[in-house]
Amino acid sequence: MPCFYYTYTYQHVFLVEFNKRSQYIELEHVYDSVYLNSSSFESALYAAGSLIELLEALVKDEIRNAFAIIRPPGHHAEHDAPMGFCLFNNVAVAVNHCMKKLDVKKTVIVDW
């Protein structure tokens, strides 16, 4: 999980991780189109983690190409807040991980 801190503040991760179910309901009204339950944080970790593993395999030439279909999505999440059904931006987390840990210098992100 340290790779999340390349992209997000401790406060943001803490907000998503440590809220109880009653607070999740309150947060749903604070953020745009975010629905939460007791498994939301763990699901978001798996989503970002799967993309990290995929990108690591590409960078290390273990695979030649890839296509990731990941749920829950992440492309609407802001750098400091959940938004649009997304808690964390999976692509930002994975790319920042590769830049910090695998010495990747450049990336191209296409989101349509």
Residue spans for each PLM region:
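HDAC/HDAC-like amidohydrolase catalytic core signature
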Residues: 1-112
